[in-house]
Curated annotation (Swiss-Prot):
<comment type="function">
    <text>Catalyzes carboxymethyl transfer from carboxy-S-adenosyl-L-methionine (Cx-SAM) to 5-hydroxyuridine (ho5U) to form 5-carboxymethoxyuridine (cmo5U) at position 34 in tRNAs.</text>
</comment>
<dbReference type="InterPro" id="IPR010017">
    <property type="entry name" value="CmoB"/>
</dbReference>
<comment type="similarity">
    <text>Belongs to the class I-like SAM-binding methyltransferase superfamily. CmoB family.</text>
</comment>
<feature type="binding site">
    <location>
        <begin position="152"/>
        <end position="154"/>
    </location>
    <ligand>
        <name>carboxy-S-adenosyl-L-methionine</name>
    </ligand>
</feature>
<dbReference type="InterPro" id="IPR027555">
    <property type="entry name" value="Mo5U34_MeTrfas-like"/>
</dbReference>
<keyword id="KW-0808">Transferase</keyword>
<protein>
    <recommendedName>
        <fullName>tRNA U34 carboxymethyltransferase</fullName>
        <ecNumber>2.5.1.-</ecNumber>
    </recommendedName>
</protein>
<keyword id="KW-0819">tRNA processing</keyword>
<dbReference type="InterPro" id="IPR029063">
    <property type="entry name" value="SAM-dependent_MTases_sf"/>
</dbReference>
<feature type="binding site">
    <location>
        <position position="196"/>
    </location>
    <ligand>
        <name>carboxy-S-adenosyl-L-methionine</name>
    </ligand>
</feature>
<feature type="binding site">
    <location>
        <position position="200"/>
    </location>
    <ligand>
        <name>carboxy-S-adenosyl-L-methionine</name>
    </ligand>
</feature>
<dbReference type="GO" id="GO:0016765">
    <property type="term" value="F:transferase activity, transferring alkyl or aryl (other than methyl) groups"/>
</dbReference>
<feature type="binding site">
    <location>
        <position position="110"/>
    </location>
    <ligand>
        <name>carboxy-S-adenosyl-L-methionine</name>
    </ligand>
</feature>
<feature type="binding site">
    <location>
        <position position="105"/>
    </location>
    <ligand>
        <name>carboxy-S-adenosyl-L-methionine</name>
    </ligand>
</feature>
<comment type="subunit">
    <text>Homotetramer.</text>
</comment>
<dbReference type="GO" id="GO:0002098">
    <property type="term" value="P:tRNA wobble uridine modification"/>
</dbReference>
<feature type="binding site">
    <location>
        <position position="315"/>
    </location>
    <ligand>
        <name>carboxy-S-adenosyl-L-methionine</name>
    </ligand>
</feature>
Length: 323
């Protein structure tokens, strides 16, 4: 059983304590009514994993845990098998005692693009919205964050996160809650808020920006990473039924348009930090994610377009501040 008591105890003593007015009831409701049909199977995989204490832990350059002496073949096989029960693994990679999880996304590449543009994370309390398996939560801790909280309603991601946590010595500096941003009160408590790969899935993107702003302290920093298209501040793509085979893509603005949206929502010091095309080296099929990936979503005769004829995915990072 995945429990959240440690997180409740942690925030009871800090500036997030007012979250306890709503959070435990939301989690209890989720545990009673909303669990996925495979959740028991996934949580059993976490339960059967050994709790390991790394001899060497690197969260600064990667997410890597090593033991002082190599694990036996049987120990490695047990860990490998249990982690494979949590497939597909989309966000990573992770290297855990000789088991290398080669995820669909090279999320480390994204982190390397984002990190140079951030304010120093040392001592910060961070929220990562739509955090997936929590890979970037661990990298935030590696960069000096005091506490990294992720929210993502996808229950497989919660189990993947808890599996990794167990293999990292039950580290309590990062936590993942099975919630969406719309379930959070206006906490106004986080020094940095990340929203990476979420905005284009929102029916109302400006409402999402307001929700992110409501989580920040005054002078807090927003890190927004999302799909963009080429164009000026008035350019926005509204795809038809699908974009790159995804049904739930609503608005893809240009980077200048997105900057304008952020300013309209009251953010200041907005800057476009990075724009890059997503490659099939960064997002691809692996033995840990065996279904279709980016290469299958692009026009085989023109890789600059999706199979639907839209511009191929490119992603921008924008940094902004709440006044």
């Amino acid at each position: 059983m995945i429990e959240f008591g440690n997180f409740y105890q942690l925030i009871a003593k800090n500036h997030l304590s007012h979250w306890l007015e709503t959070l435990p009831a939301q989690i209890a409701s989720w545990q009673r009514e909303q669990q996925h049909g495979l959740f028991k199977q996934w949580s059993n995989a976490v339960e059967f994993l050994p709790e390991m204490t790394p001899w060497r832990l690197d969260l600064l350059h990667s997410v890597t845990a090593e033991s002082e002496t190599p694990l036996s073949e049987g120990q490695l096989k047990r860990i490998d098998t249990l982690l494979r029960n949590l497939m597909p693994w989309r966000k990573g990679p992770f290297s855990l005692y000789g088991v290398d999880i080669d995820t669909e996304w090279r999320s480390d590449w994204k982190w390397d693009r984002v990190l140079p543009h951030l304010s120093d994370l040392t001592g910060r309390t961070i929220l990562d919205v739509g955090c997936g398996s929590g890979y970037h939560l661990w990298r935030m801790i590696g960069a000096g964050a005091h506490l990294a909280v992720g929210i993502d309603p996808t229950q497989l991601f919660l189990c993947q996160f808890e599996a990794v946590r167990k293999l990292l010595g039950n580290d309590q500096r990062a936590h993942l809650l099975p919630l969406g941003i719309e379930q959070l009160p206006a906490l106004k408590a986080f020094d940095t808020v990340f929203s990476m790969g979420v905005l284009y899935h929102r029916r109302s993107p400006l409402e999402h920006l307001w929700q992110l702003k409501d989580q920040l302290v005054n002078e807090g920093e927003l890190v927004l990473e999302t799909l963009v298209i080429d164009g000026d501040e008035n350019t926005v793509l509204v795809p038809g039924d699908r974009y790159a085979q995804m049904r739930n893509v609503y608005f893809i603005p240009s980077a200048p348009a997105l900057k304008k949206w952020l300013e309209k929502c009251g953010f200041i010091d907005v800057r476009i930090a990075d724009v890059c095309v997503t490659t099939t080296e960064e997002q691809r099929r692996t033995e840990w994610m065996v279904t279709e990936s980016l290469a299958d979503f692009l026009d085989p005769n023109d890789r600059s377009k999706t199979v639907e004829g839209y511009p191929a995915p490119q992603r921008a990072v924008l940094i902004a501040r709440k006044p």
